[in-house]
Every structure is written in C-alpha cells, then in structure tokens.
C-alpha cells in the first residue's frame, strides 16, 4: 500500500517541466494527490483553492515572484499559512537554506536529488 494513501495533497512549483514531471510520477506512485504550477503567482492561486498539505517550491521560478517571495506570501496568508513548504534548489546551498527558512519554509532540499531521498524528506515533513 502506498505510504501517501490518505491522499495528501502536494503542490509542485518549478519552472522546469521535466522536474515537475519527475516529481509528479514519483509522488503519485506513493499515493499523493499532485498539483503543479510553473510560476509563483499560479502557485498562490492553486494553494488558495486546493489547500495542499505540502508545497515543493523551486527557489528560482519566473513570473515576477521567485520561490522565497512566494513562500513569504503563502506563509503570511491566513488561507495558506499552514501549508508545509520544502524549498528545492540547485543554487548555493547555505545562503539559500537560510533565506528559505527565514521566509517560512519548513525544510530545504538540494538538486540534483534522488527520488527516494525526496520521498523520505516529504514523509518527514508531513509527519
């Protein structure tokens, strides 16, 4: 039985369709209900509508609202402030880790990543 069988909702936010699709396949196979966004603004819209249990957010997304700013917006919004957020980045780790956590992210994960390590991180954050 997949670990996410309770159909917890996860929103994947990344401008790279390949990353979104890899995460989609990996997490759906674990039983999670997946939503996707390619921009910060779209992520905010989906999060307000769907109320995901977890958001996996790329730190560098286009559309005028980068991942850290989007995280800050979501954490300051009464409708979405309880969503858990894992920041995903291929950039300088320590600097971005601090910025992410300061913005309200619950955890941080580096690219490239192994799907199994990401599943473990998701389970850890969701508790």
Residue positions per predicted region:
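Alpha4 helix (beta4-alpha4-beta5 surface) of REC/receiver domains from two-component response regulators
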Residues: 65-69, 92-109, 120
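Short amphipathic alpha-helix used as the core "switch/output" element in two-component signaling
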Residues: 45, 68-81
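His-Asp phosphorelay/catalytic-motif detector in bacterial-type signaling
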Residues: 51-53, 79-84
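A short, hydrophobic beta-strand element within the central beta-sheet of small alpha/beta folds
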Residues: 82-92
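C-terminal output helix
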Residues: 113-122
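Helix N-cap/capping motif at the beta->alpha junctions
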Residues: 36-45, 66-67
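Charged docking surfaces used in two-component/phosphorelay signaling
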Residues: 21-29
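Active-site residues of response regulator receiver
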Residues: 58-59, 89
């Amino acid at each position: 039985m997949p670990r996410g069988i309770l159909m917890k909702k996860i929103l994947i936010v990344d401008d790279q369709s390949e990353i979104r699709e890899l995460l989609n396949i990996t997490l759906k196979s674990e039983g999670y209900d997946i939503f996707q966004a390619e921009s910060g603004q779209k992520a905010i819209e989906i999060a307000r509508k769907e109320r995901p249990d977890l958001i996996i957010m790329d730190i560098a997304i286009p559309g005028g609202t980068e991942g850290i700013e989007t995280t800050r917006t979501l954490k300051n919004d009464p409708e979405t402030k309880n969503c858990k957020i894992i920041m995903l980045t291929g950039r300088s780790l320590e600097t971005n880790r601090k910025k992410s956590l300061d913005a309200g992210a619950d955890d941080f994960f580096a690219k490239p990543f192994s799907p199994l390590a990401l599943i473990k991180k998701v389970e850890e954050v969701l508790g």
